[in-house]
Structures are given as C-alpha cells and as structure tokens.
C-alpha cells in the first residue's frame, strides 16, 4: 500500500541519517553510503521496496583465482546463514554481503551489533580464503 511504502521510506531515511551521524562516510548516492571500516571498503545500501539494509564488505585478496578458493567460498556459504562470501577474480577482491530487514527503526546499538557481526563473519571468510 501507499502508506506502507511511505513508512518504509521513512525507516530507510532515518537509518541513513543515524549512520551518517555515527560514521565517517566518504561518499554517498541516493541508495548507498560508502566508507572504510576496519580495513574493509564498506558499502551500506537501503532498499525501501522490501525494506532492506544491505552491508557489503570488500578487501583485496592475493591470488584470487583458482578452483580451490572458489570451493572454499562455496563451503563458507554453506555455513553462513545471514550473508554470502564471494571472490571476484577480475578485480582481485574478497567480499562479504549481508542483508537485514529494516522493518523497525534502526538504533545505533542495533546497527553496530549488525555491523560487528558482519565484520566478524567477513574476517572469518577472508582469513580462510587468504591463508
């Protein structure tokens, strides 16, 4: 409904403002915020249609090619409930992407809890694949 779409847009805008007030954002556009966070290039995106908050963490990885690393990424994904691990051989980077429902107002405490879990999972994936 129209009322639900307005509510979802409002939730996304409030979440965006909260993140902007708590983090040093380097760039932004109508759907995403980008910044450096704990050694990762991070993109936070908002979808008002669903409503979703997506966090993508990326980091350069040496020797990204190879069937072994792709198999390891697939194994990580079998055990990763909230997100997915990937290796982009073309640009030589590892990424972890997690999506969370944005169905209630996002508090700073909840955002940083989500972010901490995302970074922990990204670290786990990166160290398994880079090692």
Regions found by a protein language model. Give the residues of each.
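Well-ordered alpha/beta subsegment
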Residues: 88-120, 124-131
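Hydrophobic residues embedded in beta-strands of well-ordered beta-sheets
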Residues: 31-33, 51-53, 92-94
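Short amphipathic alpha-helical segments
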Residues: 7-15, 64-69, 110, 114-117, ...
